[in-house]
Amino acid sequence: MPAVKMGVMLKGEGPGPLPPLLQQYVELRDRYPDYLLLFQVGDFYECFGEDAERLARALGLVLTHKTSKDFTTPMAGIPIRAFDAYAERLLRMGFGLAVADQVEPAEEAEGLVRREVTQLLTPGTLTQEALLPREANYLAAIATGDGWGLAFLDVSTGEFKATLLKSKSALYDELFRHRPAEVLLAPELRENEAFVAQFRKRFPVMLSEAPFDPEGEAPLALSRARGALLAYARATQGGALSVRPFRLYDPGAIVRLPEASLKALEVFEPLRGQDTLFGVLDETRTAPGRRLLQAWLRHPLLERGPLEARLDRVERFVREGALREGVRRLLFRLADLERLATRLELSRASPRDLAALRRRSLEILPELEGLLGEEVGLPDLSGLLEELRAALVEDPPLKVSEGGVIREGYDPDLDALRRAHADPVAYFLDLEVREKESTGIPTLKVGYNAVFGYYLEVTRPYYEKVPQEYRPVQTLKDRQRYTLPEMKERERELYRLEALIKRREEEVFIALRERARKEGEALREAARILAELDVYAALAEVAVRHGYTRPRFGERLRIRAGRHPVVRRRTAFVPNDLEMAHELVRVTGPNMAGKSTFLRQTALIALLAQIGSFVPAEEAELPLFDGIYTRIGASDDLAGGKSTFMVEMEEVALVLKEATERSLVLLDEVGRGTSSLDGVAIATALAEALHERRCYTLFATHYFELTALALPRLKNLHVAAKEEEGGLVFYHQVLPGPASKSYGVEVAEMAGLPKEVVERARALLSAMAARREGALEEVLERLLALDPDRLTPLEALRFLHELKALALGLPLGSMKG
């Protein structure tokens, strides 16, 4: 259940017992102690006692009081008409909501109106369209045992899957990839304060409690997570659950994209600014298409066959512009068929849902088939379409209880009741005309209210003309209201027929909804096909609009005129080439020249290719990578007590642990978080290790010592820059060979450092360079003068220490011991 504990329910003042309304409230509240109970009273959902105080604080409401003869308690409420907006805010704050509705009309109640909890709402178990985000809305469960068991369920679509992971870092990567709205933790994790604290810092989502099988009874972590997930979801849905076939998935079967890579590449969330890769690609026209595109970005493919099939479909839409525009125009009219099918299977679809199914789904399918041909593979739903056309009015109300849902001529019994109902209605319309004529009262009129029912109303000047058979029911300031025995008889008949019409219309609607529910599998299949069409057309639209090309797959990585798909939207962009094969490519150049952008652009082109998208380049051939690993940009974990350097080393350790010769590795300025000597040593050792592993590695660095590194599969590139009269000019071109210098002082000057500081830095740099050059010359002279055959081992060791001290600019003798 939700982890927001509600505690003591009701407090108040007064000597007497609770009034009946509050007794009913407390009884319902006791059944759902972990939820905030929203209790319908007329046109409002009310809370009382401490719940009222919580509601008022959370939403900024005015706190009032419920007062009876002997009792007073705090009260706060929200109007039912604004429920969706308030509920969304409460769910975002971590509240679970129990919604108690009046389940009988007030006029039919014998005493207190009966109320029941009709909905349990938590962030991860929503099916209501108004409350759901456009993205997938996952509920997750985590358990331990023979590993880390992780299960996901999207209640709104029925997607249900799970995996078994071997490490906590892999668990966090999967959670970051899926971004669940709510997480269930097994008891052994819930009771681990350190784990919970770390988890909350990384994932600000609702943590809820649910019954898990004990570890001893169900040692398999995956089974425990899966079972708890289903039990919790069923409890919130009143036992009804629509779940697609369970899928056991293996993260190793897709391209490995650790959390650090998703963040550094800004796939879903920007590090700065507003743009993301998903934002660039999201030209989808439907909600299921948008969710599918996100899923593709979370799960890039490893196999060439499925990728070529996707690219073929994208290419068709690229080549056939009129077809692409026509399909996208039709897709834009579609409802969220995937979630609508779930509401149908849960028997929660409203009249408007069925109208949307007819008008914004089924009526569009024949038009799509007309454009694409029968090979699109859409199921035949023409029978259901004709049924909905015959049964539903054009624009039905939200609730069937409001009436006017079923079209005239569809159900003979309902038609007969409506005709019978027309007689008493006509009677009251005729009554006003007849009574005006018979009494001579020109202002007489027939009215209705909920207290007195139908009445005859006469204004004060005509009181003397009122016939004796009129029975007074209400006196107002300037008018009186009356009734007649025959009016009451007709009124009772009218109420009886209205109740029969309401009941029959509900029966017909439920049967119609059941007819649609039986097509659930076909509707889900149609939703899947339409979502794929949407993504293919969207990727084609992006490709045409931005000049992307179809990638080829091979052993070499060869990109001609590659561009960064996100940066180029904000500024003029200089395209660059890259060619490598199982090599270590060292990229040097000054800050701000574009090294990091070049690294990111390469990774993004690879990622796009492996979801089946065209890529931002004039030509691209890429290997099928099994993982994309990045160490780009500075970050720290202050809450976890980790420095930038520590976080950097953890990410590098993951690369060394997982990367293979089929991996793409991007490293930017590794080692800069520590001393220069340590940094050079770490960067050199890392470069050697990755070179030995034969990864496709791009290694951006300021350490010019690394340009002397002699490895057989190493090549140097640099980002061009040149000093001109106006200062340093960045060309953003990637050229062969190492950079000639780092231009650090020039960049500092561009950043606005005071002139005297810049001049002092230049002087110090010149002095240090001269000193180092002199030291190196002295080292060389001493080596040339050395006769190694005349050195004892101790003298040789002392000589090496002296050479090292000279190279580092230290006084001789400082390296002893």
Curated annotation (Swiss-Prot):
GO molecular function, one term: mismatched DNA binding
UniProt-listed SUPFAM superfamilies: DNA repair protein MutS, domain I (SSF55271), DNA repair protein MutS, domain II (SSF53150), DNA repair protein MutS, domain III (SSF48334), P-loop containing nucleoside triphosphate hydrolases (SSF52540)
InterPro entries: DNA_mismatch_repair_MutS, DNA_mismatch_repair_MutS-lik_N, DNA_mismatch_repair_MutS/MSH, DNA_mismatch_repair_MutS_C, DNA_mismatch_repair_MutS_clamp, DNA_mismatch_repair_MutS_core, DNA_mismatch_repair_MutS_N, DNA_mismatch_repair_MutS_sf
Coiled coil: none
Extent of the signal sequence: none
Keyword DNA damage (UniProt): yes
Keyword tags: ATP-binding, DNA damage, DNA repair, DNA-binding, Nucleotide-binding
Binding positions for ATP per the UniProt entry: 589-596
CDD domains: ABC_MutS1
GO terms of biological process kind: mismatch repair
Record-stated family: Belongs to the DNA mismatch repair MutS family.
Function comment: This protein is involved in the repair of mismatches in DNA. It is possible that it carries out the mismatch recognition step. This protein has a weak ATPase activity.
Name of the protein this chain belongs to: DNA mismatch repair protein MutS
